[in-house]
Structure formats: structure tokens, C-alpha cells
């Protein structure tokens, strides 16, 4: 019965109470540690947004599980990627959390639906004793409150999850919490009557409308007064201008103003930004395959060159593909230099370097060609992709490159068949399994990059996107360092 006006909406036996009564819910008041899975949280945020719009006339923004109002929640997950953003004068970090509980069977399933976006102040992370460069790949306890408008988590505290046992215990508690939250919250009429009587006793000389919160009449609702009705026309203009300025610097900027849910366009950034010779795509720390149109544009502008070679990295990539196509296990330095395809790559790179020279110190084109060839070969040797059979005869062993590429193809094929979204490639494992003691993380990255490009081209209906991050848990010289592969599948395939 709603004789006290304490129910905002009722569906069968489930009552959605007015906000004033939320404090009597143990999950809202903080007496219970509310643990939630990432998949459940993302679903509940979408449902809660509809509940607040339909049942509370958009005068409330609250996370609900059934009719339980929830404030601070507790999750455990692995940080998959992060991004830095300045909002006003404060620097924030937006990271994505995954605990493998999101439903991948949804139509149009994307990585944004799989991962939970979390927002935290950079200064706060430092105050908790965490190293920002080591965040990616870590499993953390995350505490915070849900933001329905932006469908993200406002982080209040982070701490490390130190063991698998700790993570398993969290999962057990969360499963039990699930069952408890599935039981609707209810307050008896007797309790409601007592609360109503207490309200009258606290302010006996005040009228019913004045005694309560402006959002309620008695214990029920009263339409809140709009702030706009209290402002002048000039103040309204100033307010609109301020909103415009805030929107410009907001990371939630969206061209669709009809919907209050703004999606943050997320890019993954490697935490090791000083990694030499990796050239992780546009951002400098990440490898991606979304620059096809840019490559076509450069190819058109450089049509007079035999091969489009904008820099040493692209030239090295082209040389590596040429070596993979050779039907031989070894080749001499002189024979390699005489190959038509290699000459084309070297000539194009030398042309590029020739145009970049300082007028005061000019080298001949022939000398630049020889230097470019030596530099490209030395880079592959230093990465362990090709070996020197004999220093006197300068014969190159091509088996390391071929074996690693074959391993990369098989590894990516397995990940795709299992529909895995991430995969780890450890340097020490590759060195031992393939008997390549001189292979480096740089070399592994370059080979997997080319293999992923080829796979996406062969199976565009399956593999939608991919990117590579460095494994942040170890330094580059550490034998246990490696890379993280991220795969995003097409909606029809997933």
C-alpha cells in the first residue's frame, strides 16, 4: 500500500521506493561490501538509466540491482588499456577493466561492450602507491560509483590483487552477492508508518511541504524548482556559454545530443613509451591497422618511386616481407643486395634520405643506398630475425625469421578459433621453444604485426581490428618480457 506516498513505482511485488528511504537499504548505506562482476555492472547501468528516466522522471541518477539502490561498488579485473585526458585543470586517466564476464553473444558485440571504462584522477593513483606505467596487465581491486550518463565507473580507490586465491575468493563472494541482490528489497507498512511518524515528530510546527526534502511532498515527490526559472536572460546566456566551453574540453563530446549516454572513443596506449625502434603506429606506443587510407594517399603522392618507403621502419618491414618470400634458408650479403625487390626498397629509402639531407653536408646517392642497405640489414640482425652464418662471408641465416613467422601464424590462428580477445607472447617462451636465443621483443612485435596484417586481409569477415601492447610487467631487457595481442572480431563472427 502506498498510503504514505513512499513508492515511486511498483511492478508486482517489487517496489521502487523514494530516494529518502534509500538509506535504510544495507547495500546503499555501505554496511555491505557490494561486489559486482563487470558484465553485470554494464548491464545494470543500462537498465538503471531506464529506471531513473521512467520511474523517477530523470530526477535521480542511481545504480539499481532490481530495486536495490547501490552506491559504492567493488570489482576485480585486469586493466586492458588506458588513456590520459585533461578536463579543466585536472588530469584524469581513463582505463578499461575486464574480468571476462561480459556477454559476447549480444548482437553487434564490440570491445566497448566487453570492457568497463573507469575514470580516475592521475594524482590519486600516485597517492595509492601505484606506478602508472605498470597499470596495463595488472589485476586490481577497484572501488567506485557508477556514472549512468557516461556509462562508466568513477573510481574512488584502487589496490593490487596479489594472488589467484584472492581473486577466486572475490568471485565466490560476488556469486553469493548476486543471489542476495536478486531478492527484492521491501519495507513493511509498519516500518514506513514509524518513519513517517518520526518525520512529523522531528518538525511538529512546520508544514508538511516544508518539513521534507524539496524533492518530496510528505514522503512523496514534489517537482523540484528549476534553477533556470530563478535566473535572468543574461545569466542563462552565460550558463549556456559555460556549458559550451565545458563540452569542448570534455572527453564525452558527442555529435548526438538526443541521447544522454555518451560513448568515450577509447584507444589503447602502451605504458612503455620509450620502447626503442618499435614505432607503435600513430600514437607512438601502439601498433594498429587503421591507416590503410593514409598509406594509399602516400602511395599516390610517391608514384614516381618504385616502392612507397616513407621511413626506415616501413623499409625494414618491406625487406622482412621480401625475405619471407624467398625459397631459401640462407643468402649472402651480395646476393641479397642484387635482388630486384631489395634494390627497389633501398633505392626508395635512399631517395627519401637524400631529400632529408642538410645542404651543408651532402652525401652522394650511391653512398646513401649502401648505408641504407647496411642499416636495414643490421636492424634485422640486432633484433635476432636473421643471423650471420659466417662473418667473413657475410651469409645470412633466414630460418629465425621464417620460424618465428610460422609460429606467429599458428598462434594467431588458435586465438581466433577460440575467439580469444587477448593473448600473451612471452620472450623467454619464444626463445626456448623456437631455439632463438638472440630474438628480441622488438623482433617479435614486428613479425606479429605483419602476420596480423596478413590475417586481417585474408579474413576481413572474421577479424575486425587488432592492436599490440607491450607487456608492462617486466622491463625490456628482462627475459620474461613480452607482448599482449588484442583481437576484435566482426559482429557476425562473434
From Swiss-Prot:
Residues 62-159 bind DNA. The keyword DNA-binding does not apply. Its main location: nucleus. GO terms for biological process: negative regulation of telomere maintenance via telomerase; regulation of telomere maintenance via telomerase; telomere capping. Changing residue 397 to A: Modest telomere elongation phenotype. It is found in: Chromosome, Telomere. This is Protein STN1. It comes from Saccharomyces cerevisiae (strain ATCC 204508 / S288c) (Baker's yeast).
Amino acid at each position: 500500500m502506498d498510503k504514505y506516498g513512499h513508492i515511486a513505482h511498483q511492478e508486482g511485488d517489487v517496489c521502487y521506493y523514494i530516494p529518502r528511504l534509500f538509506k535504510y537499504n544495507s547495500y546503499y548505506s555501505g554496511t555491505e561490501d557490494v561486489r559486482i562482476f563487470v558484465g553485470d555492472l554494464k548491464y545494470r547501468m543500462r537498465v538503471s538509466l531506464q529506471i531513473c528516466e521512467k520511474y523517477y522522471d530523470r530526477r535521480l541518477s542511481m545504480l539499481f540491482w532490481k530495486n536495490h539502490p547501490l552506491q559504492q561498488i567493488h570489482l576485480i579485473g585486469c586493466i586492458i588499456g588506458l588513456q590520459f585526458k585533461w578536463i579543466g585543470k585536472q588530469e584524469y586517466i581513463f582505463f578499461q577493466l575486464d574480468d571476462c564476464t561480459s556477454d559476447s553473444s549480444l548482437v553487434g558485440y564490440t570491445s566497448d561492450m566487453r570492457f568497463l571504462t573507469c575514470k580516475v584522477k592521475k594524482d590519486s593513483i600516485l597517492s595509492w602507491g601505484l606506478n602508472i606505467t605498470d597499470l596495463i596487465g595488472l589485476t586490481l581491486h577497484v572501488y567506485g560509483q557508477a556514472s549512468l550518463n557516461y556509462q562508466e565507473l568513477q573510481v574512488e580507490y584502487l589496490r593490487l590483487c596479489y594472488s589467484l586465491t584472492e581473486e577466486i575468493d572475490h568471485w565466490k563472494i560476488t556469486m553469493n552477492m548476486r543471489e542476495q541482490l536478486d531478492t527484492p528489497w521491501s519495507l513493511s507498512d509498519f516500518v514506513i508508518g514509524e518513519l513517517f511518524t518520526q518525520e512529523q515528530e522531528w518538525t511538529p510546527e512546520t508544514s508538511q511541504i516544508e518539513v521534507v526534502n524539496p524533492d518530496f511532498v510528505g514522503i512523496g515527490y514534489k517537482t523540484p524548482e528549476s534553477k533556470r526559472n530563478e535566473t535572468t536572460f543574461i545569466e542563462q546566456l552565460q550558463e549556456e556559454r559555460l556549458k559550451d566551453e565545458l563540452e569542448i574540453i570534455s572527453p564525452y563530446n558527442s555529435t548526438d545530443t538526443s541521447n544522454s549516454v555518451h560513448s568515450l572513443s577509447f584507444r589503447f596506449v602502451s605504458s612503455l613509451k620509450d620502447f626503442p625502434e618499435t614505432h607503435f603506429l600513430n600514437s607512438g606506443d601502439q601498433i594498429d591497422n587503421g591507416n590503410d587510407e593514409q598509406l594509399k594517399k602516400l602511395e599516390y603522392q610517391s608514384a614516381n618511386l618504385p616502392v612507397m618507403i616513407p621511413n626506415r621502419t616501413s623499409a625494414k618491414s618491406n625487406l622482412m616481407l621480401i625475405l619471407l618470400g624467398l625459397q631459401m634458408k640462407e643468402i649472402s650479403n651480395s646476393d641479397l643486395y642484387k635482388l630486384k625487390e631489395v634494390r627497389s626498397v633501398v633505392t626508395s629509402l635512399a631517395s627519401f634520405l637524400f631529400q632529408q639531407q642538410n645542404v651543408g653536408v651532402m652525401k652522394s646517392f650511391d653512398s646513401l643506398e649502401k648505408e641504407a642497405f647496411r642499416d636495414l640489414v643490421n636492424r634485422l640482425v640486432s633484433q635476432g630475425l636473421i643471423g650471420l652464418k659466417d662473418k667473413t662471408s657475410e651469409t645470412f641465416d633466414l630460418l629465425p625469421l621464417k620460424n618465428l613467422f610460422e609460429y606467429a601464424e599458428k598462434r594467431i590462428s588458435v586465438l581466433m578459433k577460440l575467439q580469444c580477445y587477448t593473448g600473451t607472447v612471452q620472450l623467454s617462451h619464444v626463445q626456448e621453444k623456437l631455439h632463438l636465443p638472440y630474438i628480441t621483443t622488438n623482433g617479435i612485435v614486428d613479425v606479429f604485426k605483419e602476420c596480423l596484417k596478413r590475417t586481417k586481409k585474408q579474413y576481413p569477415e572474421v577479424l575486425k581490428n587488432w592492436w599490440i601492447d607491450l607487456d608492462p610487467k617486466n622491463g625490456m631487457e628482462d627475459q620474461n618480457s613480452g607482448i599482449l595481442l588484442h583481437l576484435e572480431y566482426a559482429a557476425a563472427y562473434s
